[in-house]
Amino acid sequence: MSYTITAQTRTEIGKGSSRRLRHAGKVPAVIYGAGKEPVSIVFDHKDIINAQANDDFYTSVVTIVLDGKEVGVRAQAMQRHAFKPIIEHVDFVYA
């Protein structure tokens, strides 16, 4: 199964910025690896919560449409809230 997530590049970095994004229903994330510069991104929480419910999300290549350009990535790490069904941050690596 293929997964596609639409994301935007983050302009504000830091704890306060991340908290504001989470409060607005967004998920901060980062894409790194393959000798490229890390890219901070943000996307809607509903996009990732539905996709990650399937086990093959963690092993398959996820397509992120980042500012109109498609990027193939894999989920490396995911931080979740302690008791709420909320994803707080995702690390992706280039596929």
Swiss-Prot record:
User: What is the gene name?
Assistant: rplY
A single GO molecular function, which one? structural constituent of ribosome
Gene3D superfamilies the record matches: Ribosomal Protein L25, Chain P
Describe its assembly. Part of the 50S ribosomal subunit; part of the 5S rRNA/L5/L18/L25 subcomplex. Contacts the 5S rRNA. Binds to the 5S rRNA independently of L5 and L18.
Function of the protein? This is one of the proteins that binds to the 5S RNA in the ribosome where it forms part of the central protuberance.
Q: Which UniProt keywords apply?
A: Ribonucleoprotein, Ribosomal protein, RNA-binding, rRNA-binding
Q: Which family does it belong to?
A: Belongs to the bacterial ribosomal protein bL25 family.
This chain's protein is named: Large ribosomal subunit protein bL25
**Which BP terms does GO give this entry?**
translation
The record's annotation in NCBIfam families points to: bL25_bact_ctc, PRK05943.1
Domain of life where this protein originates: Bacteria
GO CC terms of this entry: cytosolic large ribosomal subunit
Record bears the keyword Glycoprotein: no
Keyword Ribonucleoprotein (UniProt): yes
